[in-house]
Amino acid sequence: MTTHPLTMPIPEYFEEILESVRSDVSGEVAQYIPQLKDADPNPLALAMCTVDGHIYGAGDDEHEFTMQSVSKPFAYALALQEQGPEKVFATVGLEPSGEAFNELSLDGSTNRPMNPMINAGAIAVNQLINGSESSVEDRVEKIRSYFSALAGRELNIDRQLSETEIEGADRNLSIAHMLRNYGIIEDDAHDAVLSYTLQCSVKVTARDLAVMTATLAAGGTQPLTGEKLVDARVARLVLSTMASAGMYDEAGQWLATVGIPAKSGVSGGLVGVLPGQLGLATFSPRLNSQGNPVRGVEIFKALSEDMGLHLMSAELLTQHAVRAIEERGDTTVIQLQGAMNFSAAENFLFTVTDHDFTGEKVVLDISRVPMFRPMGRRLVKEGLRRIRDNGFKVAIYDPEDILPDFDFSDGTKSPQVDDPEEL
């Protein structure tokens, strides 16, 4: 039998998600940075990286943009890794502020910024990196190099944008002066804001951000290089802070509806992390009144619903989706187990893509699957359809009637068998 490599349907699904939100032109690009104000508002991208290093992308996922506030959790990770939690916690708190990202939100008793996801906290965190005696350039190079290691490639800084941004950084300068007055930072206010602005000006793509967030999802191990860049405890601290404060004064609604740690930036980037499983990133420049990307938020809502991403869900993957693949005469039986959310279905797809099938028949045994999420159902059936289109006779063994239908995406239907060996 002539067979062909199976292809992955995930990018096709991502393209559908992008098309579903592309017509939404509400919101506006950031107005206070000239390059962002004049930027094309139409690029749209979605990228994902699993903790196993599988990367998927759609749309303008190779389009470069500056990180802006999306840089905050990664700089926070570097400060925690370098200086230790005790020193960092003495400088910046962990509580959500409930205020806009550029408010001077300080703890009333300690004068610490409320959290590292607002500008006051991010400026303070930036000043911890490479030590208080560091020059601006040495500190910024430490940050750029660390971000590059997280992304798995060399990243560059948009110096032209940072120069323009610093010219209009009056509010951040006033925040830095206040932090210096309270003894939170030691650098000259201008140098502190310059260092922070250069941090925000590191250029990335959505694919870069997906890999960077997947590193946090993997407990600090970079999924492409295998390098340990963040201690597991540090990764937990960063993700916890993203969950409580990453989406500014929209954080509570975000956690309730989407349910994963996330961080947005005014250039249009938005990242999210499903611990232990994957990192996600979108790019769409138009922002809502809270400063979060309009279409990015809608994409994450759709992904959370379809893929079963919510942290409070009881169905998150705890075991390998493929229990066994057995050759029984001329029939290959693929046994699945556990709840079929996106991560489980992706595990199934990668397993069958690499498998060298023998014989002429393939039966998918889902007797140990208690439920399917919409995206899990779609990916599993699409994978089976592509096995069929590769020349095999296929069927599904579903004694508990877990699947509501056996329809494939091309309008055909998979047969059902009462015994895995009867096909």
From Swiss-Prot:
InterPro entries: Beta-lactam/transpept-like, Glutaminase, STAS_dom, STAS_dom_sf. Keywords: Hydrolase. Residues 27-312 are annotated as: Glutaminase. Substrate binds at residues 69, 119, 165, 172, 196, 248, 266. Residues 321-423 form the STAS domain. The keyword Hydrolase applies. It comes from the Bacteria. Belongs to the glutaminase family. PANTHER family: GLUTAMINASE. HAMAP family: Glutaminase. Homotetramer. This is Glutaminase. It comes from Corynebacterium efficiens (strain DSM 44549 / YS-314 / AJ 12310 / JCM 11189 / NBRC 100395).
